[in-house]
C-alpha cells in the first residue's frame, strides 16, 4: 500500500498551470516539522491536479497550514541539457486547509487535526478536545466557497482527486 498523510505549511504561494492535455496542475512544497529536539523541517515536494490545484491557488497562500493525503511517486525527466533528473514527490489525492484567519495557531491546529483524525480513523476525538467551533466539510465543486470571507474562514475543504486521474 502506498499512502502518505502529511501536515505542514505551504512554503510559497501555489501557482497552477494548464498542461497541453487541458488538465490543471500545481506543484507545491510543504514544510513538515520534525518532532525531534533539534526540530528540523522536512521540505516535501507535492503535486495536485484539477480540483485540488484550483483550490490551492484560489484559497491558500504561503504559510497556510494544510493536510494532504496522497501517494509517493518517483519519476524521471531529461532537462534541456540532456541530463536525466530523478524526482520523488507526493501526489495529493486529498487536500485540507487547516488555516483559519483570526484564530491563534494552537486553536487552528487543535480543531482541524481532530476533525482530520476522525475522518481517517473513525474515532471521534471531541471527548479529548472540547471545542465549540463548527466544522463544515464541503466539496470543492460547490459554489459556497465564494459567499464571503467569514464563511470561507469556517470551511474545511476536502477535495478528492481519484476521479480526475487518468
Curated annotation (Swiss-Prot):
Q: How does it assemble?
A: Homotetramer.
On the tree of life, the source organism's domain of life is Bacteria
Q: Which UniProt keyword terms apply here? A: DNA-binding
Q: Which SUPFAM superfamilies match?
A: Nucleic acid-binding proteins
Which Gene Ontology terms of cellular component type are present? nucleoid
Tell me yes or no: is DNA-binding among this UniProt entry's keywords: yes
Quick one: where's region Disordered?
126-151
* Entry-linked PANTHER family: SINGLE-STRANDED DNA-BINDING PROTEIN
Q: Which InterPro entries match?
A: NA-bd_OB-fold, Primosome_PriB/ssb, ssDNA-bd
Protein's organism: Ureaplasma parvum serovar 3 (strain ATCC 700970)
Q: What is this protein called?
A: Single-stranded DNA-binding protein
SSB domain span: 1-99
Give GO BP annotations, semicolon-separated.
DNA replication
Q: What segments bear the compositional bias annotation Polar residues?
A: 126-135
| The keyword DNA-binding appears for this protein | yes
Stretches of Low complexity bias are at 136-147
Q: Which NCBIfam families match?
A: ssb (TIGR00621)
Q: Its Gene Ontology molecular function terms?
A: single-stranded DNA binding
Amino acid at each position: 500500500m502506498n499512502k502518505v498523510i502529511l501536515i505542514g505549511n505551504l512554503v510559497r504561494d501555489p501557482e497552477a498551470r494548464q498542461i497541453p492535455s487541458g488538465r490543471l496542475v500545481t506543484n507545491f512544497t510543504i514544510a513538515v516539522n520534525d518532532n525531534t529536539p533539534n526540530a528540523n523541517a522536512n521540505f516535501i515536494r507535492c503535486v495536485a491536479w484539477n480540483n485540488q490545484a484550483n483550490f490551492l491557488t484560489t484559497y491558500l497562500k504561503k504559510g497556510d497550514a494544510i493536510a494532504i493525503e496522497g501517494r509517493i511517486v518517483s519519476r524521471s525527466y531529461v532537462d534541456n541539457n540532456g541530463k536525466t533528473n530523478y524526482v520523488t514527490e507526493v501526489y495529493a489525492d486529498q487536500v485540507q486547509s487547516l488555516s483559519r484567519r483570526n484564530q491563534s495557531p494552537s486553536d487552528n491546529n487543535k480543531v482541524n487535526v481532530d476533525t482530520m483524525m476522525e475522518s481517517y480513523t473513525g474515532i471521534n476525538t471531541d471527548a479529548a478536545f472540547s471545542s465549540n467551533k463548527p466544522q463544515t466539510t464541503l466539496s470543492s465543486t460547490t459554489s459556497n466557497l465564494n459567499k464571503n470571507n467569514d464563511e470561507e474562514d469556517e470551511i474545511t475543504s476536502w477535495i478528492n482527486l481519484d476521479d480526475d486521474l487518468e
